[in-house]
Amino acid sequence: RKIDVLINNAGAGITGPLEEIPMEKLKTNFETNLFGPIGIINAVLPSMRQQKSGLVINITSIAAYMGLPFRGVYSASKGALELVTEAYRMELKPFDIQMTNVAPAAFSTNIAAGRYHAPENDNSPYKSTYGKTLKLLNGHVDAGQDPIILAKLVHSIIQTKKPKIHYKVGAFLQRFSIILKRLLPDRIFEKLLMSFYRL
């Protein structure tokens, strides 16, 4: 059986104050966003190694590049997948197996429908800030770009002989935020991020 391409596109959203997200929900998110993809990758590697070719595309997120308020678990799980991909790439070089990350920004999908939201508790010290962030997040998804843009990028990567390690796709401002994080002092970038989230 020949497996030429694996696309790890499964992903689960999760929002809430880190202090208030149940540990079981955190673990479930990592199962979907990190451990699941690793398990599938490991399942196909023997076939790819035998045929001396193969491509794995891991769909991560722009959120993987920074810790986002009330999305810390999601940022962490997707960020971990980015780093795992980098490690896999080096380990798999001798077998001519390619691996890459694709980090989308906001796209108009149904991810919000399946996202776990920590309850908005009236007694929570995060009530006002978390509520504002939730509304903002849902607005970003509703106003997101057409997923066909992402699909076309994935198709072009499959046609590429030597894919890059990382691809970012989506609105310019969201992609540019990664560059800003590298260029700006940490405190300045943190202030910009908090301003964006109206915190």
Where are these regions (language model features)?
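Active-site helix of classical SDR
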Residues: 41, 77-80
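A short, exposed helix-loop element centered on a Lys and neighboring polar residues
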Residues: 41-42, 86
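Conserved NAD(P)H cofactor-binding loop of Rossmann-fold oxidoreductase domains
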Residues: 9-14
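C-terminal beta-strand-loop-alpha-helix "lid" module of Rossmann-like NAD(P)-dependent dehydrogenases
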Residues: 93-141
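Residue(s) in the substrate-gating loop at a strand-loop-helix junction
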Residues: 61
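Substrate-binding pocket helix/loop in short-chain dehydrogenase/reductase
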Residues: 17-18, 25-27
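Active-site loop immediately N-terminal to the catalytic Tyr-X3-Lys motif
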Residues: 19, 66-72
